[in-house]
Amino acid sequence: MTDRKARRLVALNTGLALIACLVLDVPRPAHADEVDDTALTLVRERHLGDSLGWLGYQVASRTVTFSTLVEALGKTQAQELVQNELQRLQPEFQAQWDANLAAAYAHAFTAEELRSLNAGDDSPELANKFRAKNGEVGADMKARSADLLGNFVSQALTSAQQSLEH
């Protein structure tokens, strides 16, 4: 019986030691708010969300509404009108766009990696991961922001059309 107790004690101590090693070795997960704030800082400081206006124009220029504006005004004036409307509306959508992009980065990177990127860590390993995750972040962003982009473009085109009627 003492042999059995000794084996149990060894097994228990070994198990506890393994658990302790795992717990101490694994970095503590950051709070979601911390990751989101860190990711949002990355997006804002590196101007990663600045493409909203450009993407809005790319989407708008492929619509029937845009073609109608071109027929009514000519290509140059239609482009100018739509770009002006997108620029006017962009501040209403930019904060949510940046938040969605930050969430996509927070999903792809750890809090520590985001902090390193914010601190200007240009280590080859982190730079390679940043490039490698670009597609994943883009797909995540598309899923999060397709409706937002659609609303942005729709409002700009509606506004542009209404300006013709006045």
Regions found by a protein language model. Name each.
Residues R46, S67, Q77-H166:
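Compact alpha-helical subdomains of small soluble proteins
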Residues A30-E34, H107:
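Short, surface-exposed loop and linker segments with low hydrophobicity and enrichment for Pro/Ser/Thr
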Residues M1-D3, A30-H31, V70, G74-Q77, ...:
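A general boundary/transition motif marking the beginning of the first structured unit of a protein
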Residues E34-L86:
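Early exported N-terminus immediately downstream of N-terminal targeting peptides
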Residues T2-L16:
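Bacterial N-terminal signal peptides that target proteins for export
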Residues A11-T14, L22-V23, L55-Q58:
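Short, amphipathic alpha-helical segments
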Residues A20-P29:
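C-terminal segment of classical bacterial N-terminal signal peptides
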